[in-house]
Amino acid sequence: MAENLAGNDRLIWIDLEMTGLDTDRDSIIEIATIVTDAQLNVLAEGPELAIAHPLETLEAMDEWNRNQHRRSGLWQRVIDSQVTHAQAEAQTVAFLSEWIRAGASPMCGNSICQDRRFLHRQMSRLERYFHYRNLDVSTIKELARRWAPTVANGFAKSSAHTALSDVRDSIDELRHYRQFMGALGGDTAAGVEN
């Protein structure tokens, strides 16, 4: 698929579900990726993988995570999974390498710095596949909340808290904000090319 690697403006979107937010103690339990073009059109969805963990690890999560991951079905998927962190990382890198060269895309998503911290510790090869820059939709959301609350309030996530649904939400959320960005959104009348 070498012809697929031609576009340098492709974006890799990622989301992780974890046992908690402590990057030193908690663990990745699900990963999903999507590749889009620069205009946020989905080109391909990567593997959506629940990562095997013992029941004791899940039971040690805080109440919010236990309830959320049971409700979403992720709890059972993790228990049933045979996929290790190393296998999830290898499958994800293999998928990405079909669509975009290493180092070409920023890491894209919501609160992506947290995901990067977990990847650095548990899937460092995948973390290095991304450019060092981040495209964090949460930054735009925080600015809109402060400067244009009606814009921020105009988008509602599905809040399923599964990795793939969260990736889709992040892309949809950026599409929402893009319509309010004028020339930054590709307004050719303002002399900006797409």
Curated annotation (Swiss-Prot):
Q: Which residues form the Exonuclease domain?
A: 11-174
EC annotation? 3.1.15.-
Judged by the first EC level, this protein's enzyme class is hydrolase
Q: Which CDD domains does the annotation name?
A: Orn
| One cellular component term from this protein's GO annotations in UniProt | cytoplasm
Any matching Pfam family? RNase_T
List the Gene Ontology MF annotations in alphabetical order. Answer: 3'-5'-RNA exonuclease activity; nucleic acid binding
Active site at 132
Per UniProt, which keywords does this protein have?
Answer: Cytoplasm, Exonuclease, Hydrolase, Nuclease
Single Gene Ontology BP annotation? DNA metabolic process
Which SUPFAM superfamilies does this UniProt record tie to the protein?
Ribonuclease H-like
Tell me which domain of life the UniProt entry assigns to the organism this sequence originates from: Bacteria
Subcellular localization, as worded in the UniProt entry: Cytoplasm
Q: Which InterPro entries match?
A: Exonuclease_RNaseT/DNA_pol3, Oligoribonuclease, RNaseH-like_sf, RNaseH_sf
Q: What is its main location?
A: cytoplasm
Annotated function? 3'-to-5' exoribonuclease specific for small oligoribonucleotides.
Protein family: Belongs to the oligoribonuclease family.
This chain belongs to which protein, by name?
Oligoribonuclease
Q: Which organism is it from?
A: Xanthomonas axonopodis pv. citri (strain 306)
Q: Taxonomic lineage of this organism?
A: Bacteria, Pseudomonadati, Pseudomonadota, Gammaproteobacteria, Lysobacterales
Gene name, per UniProt, is orn
